[in-house]
């Protein structure tokens, strides 16, 4: 039985190396591909939207295929899905102007976002704040301000994780994978 919803976090907590599959120029985002990828060898699936299509309808279908094709061999409902967004992380302003993309991606129920070209501490801080709920006060006043992610996406994201809306809000905040390169 899986200890975490996100296998990548589960392995990192055990000081294990994690491996991914998926290109940086797009991914086949169909229900059928989700069925195929449900038993992928990798610890997480990278969905490259930085250089690929920003396709939320396709991402919805793909994740539905992962759910219907699951669970994984490790007992997780789906493989972890981490999306590279097409937002350049070079400044706080760019992040804040494009935060809607993070909200859209997270509303699909993905397990994390990879911010490409994170070039300044202010950009990284703005990214984290954009992905966090305002109700979570951890770190606020110690380098972070309140989160700006709205709490209206649980009807779509919680079922992906196999939990109710309140549980999603509790679990999404501390285990959301924010990968910054």
Predicted regions located by residue number:
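Expand to "…catalyze enediolate/carbanion chemistry for C-C bond making/breaking, isomerization
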Residues: 1-181
């Amino acid at each position: 039985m899986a200890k975490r919803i996100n296998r990548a976090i589960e392995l990192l907590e055990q000081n294990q190396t994690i491996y991914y599959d998926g290109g940086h120029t797009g991914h086949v985002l169909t229900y059928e591909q989700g069925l195929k990828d449900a038993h992928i060898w990798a610890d997480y699936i990278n969905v490259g939207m930085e250089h690929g299509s920003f396709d939320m309808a396709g991402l919805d279908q793909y994740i539905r295929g992962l759910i219907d094709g699951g669970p994984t061999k490790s007992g997780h409902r789906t493989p972890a899905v981490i999306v590279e967004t097409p937002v350049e992380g070079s400044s706080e302003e760019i992040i804040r102007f494009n935060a809607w993309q993070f909200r859209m991606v997270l509303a699909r129920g993905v397990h994390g976002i990879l911010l490409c070209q994170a070039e300044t501490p202010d950009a990284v801080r703005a990214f984290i704040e954009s992905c966090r709920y305002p109700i979570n006060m951890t770190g606020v006043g110690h380098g972070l301000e309140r989160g700006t992610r709205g709490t209206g996406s649980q009807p779509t994201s919680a079922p992906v994780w196999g939990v109710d809306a309140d549980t999603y809000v509790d679990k999404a905040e501390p285990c959301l994978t924010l990968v910054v390169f």
